[in-house]
Amino acid sequence: MKKIITKRLVIRPFKDGDAPAMFKNWTGDDRVSNFCRWYTHKDVSVTEGFLDYCKSADYCWAITLKDIDEPIGCIDLVGMDANGVPEIGYALGYDYWGKGIMTETVKAIIADLFEKGYDKVEACHNIDNPASGRVMEKAGMTYCRDSEGIRKFGSDEKVKLKYYEIHK
């Protein structure tokens, strides 16, 4: 995977040594994991396992600021539907919320997926996290449907989701 450079960000593959910053910036923060399907990491060793997954995944990116090569969030393909439409998912450190960083990231990833030949991209958010829906809208996506999904991996608890899409 190549790096994707935007106005303020370097979106790059994960690398050895990223786990401490990941844990500090988002995986160890209840405020971030509250709306994600994964549980808050209790220590950096759990994040090391997640880092191994990220490094081996075909499409999982670290979000870093241009001037600091430290992951502040991540974005990846969390699924592909039966028609081959990719679904993106993301998480961003709490200290970076409300600054347009995730919108900038989502726009860049959508452009990359379109460049790779996809004609449509989807994303969803927990209905209790409307700020994530605003990120999708600001990135050019439009609401397409409601759905239901699991609240957390390994849990039977359900949560309502709103799906957004964008076409090439």
Whereabouts are the PLM-identified features?
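Acyl-donor (CoA/ACP) binding surface of acyl/acetyltransferases
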Residues: 1-21, 25-30, 34, 60, ...
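Conserved GNAT-fold acetyl-CoA-binding loop/helix
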Residues: 31-51
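A short helix-loop-beta-strand connector motif used in the catalytic cores of GNAT acetyltransferases and
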Residues: 51-62
